[in-house]
From Swiss-Prot:
Protein name: Endo-1,4-beta-xylanase
Gene assigned in the entry: XYNA
Family matches, as InterPro entries: GH10, GH10_AS, GH10_dom, Glycoside_hydrolase_SF
Family label: Belongs to the glycosyl hydrolase 10 (cellulase F) family.
BP GO terms, sorted: xylan catabolic process
Keyword vocabulary terms for this entry: Carbohydrate metabolism, Disulfide bond, Glycosidase, Hydrolase, Polysaccharide degradation, Pyrrolidone carboxylic acid, Signal, Xylan degradation
Single GO MF annotation: endo-1,4-beta-xylanase activity
Location of the GH10 domain: 29-326
Catalytic site positions: E157, E263
Pyrrolidone carboxylic acid: modified positions: Q27
Signal peptide annotation: 1-26
Listed EC numbers: 3.2.1.8
Gene3D superfamilies (UniProt xref): Glycosidases
Disulphide connectivity of cysteines: C281-C287
Organism: Thermoascus aurantiacus
Amino acid sequence: MVRPTILLTSLLLAPFAAASPILEERQAAQSVDQLIKARGKVYFGVATDQNRLTTGKNAAIIQADFGQVTPENSMKWDATEPSQGNFNFAGADYLVNWAQQNGKLIRGHTLVWHSQLPSWVSSITDKNTLTNVMKNHITTLMTRYKGKIRAWDVVNEAFNEDGSLRQTVFLNVIGEDYIPIAFQTARAADPNAKLYINDYNLDSASYPKTQAIVNRVKQWRAAGVPIDGIGSQTHLSAGQGAGVLQALPLLASAGTPEVAITELDVAGASPTDYVNVVNACLNVQSCVGITVWGVADPDSWRASTTPLLFDGNFNPKPAYNAIVQDLQQ
């Protein structure tokens, strides 16, 4: 009596067992990176680091579905130069080596930022000292990875919500010139890397911060500051995706050779919001690509909002499938 039960169970399960590899092949064939490249863009990327690449299905999904990686934390100042002149490249080296071995583009993130900044930097009060420290940090990182990194977020989150420049140790001690100095230093260190100014809440064309960064980038570029791109982080609340359709063309109007969506996640991961952001990039000729800020929801910096394209079991969510369908049109 047992044998027929086993046979029946086997027959019932057989279609599902057979479907698994087919499903995996289908997902691999529907790489959002391959699809967006077919639409004329350079990459569809993701933020990651060694701790992610060595756990779960992160590495396999990135290999199959994404074409660019941004280090989530390993290239930030607190990780790379925790004390003055003492550099630690272990995490950054791992990411760069993995990306090169797997044929992925790399976005360097980030060189000058007020957050995750060691206290030895934030406590500097002398202008010349801080200028030299900043220049040395930029030059050291960019020289180490010269020719390996497609683009760098040179200056990150320099603006307040009202469009004024954020009060940071760099602004307060060096003055507004810290931004031109940072970009000029970066250009000298790796002339072929694309140099970005990167910020969040650039998701509405009518928002003061969005308008301010456009105006200031125009001014800086007119003065010869080598800014190649504006990065819009695009950390969205539910329903904000539609605003990017108007905001991204405004950012592109600053005249930089490139713009990019650099840290995308959406609270609730609405397919509509994600598709709106993808279409915004498709509609703007200078938009080179999109980077989502992590693979799976539990690893997100805002995990409780389930904002990413894969769930906790590394299964693609409706937003991922919606992007695939959108890019296939």
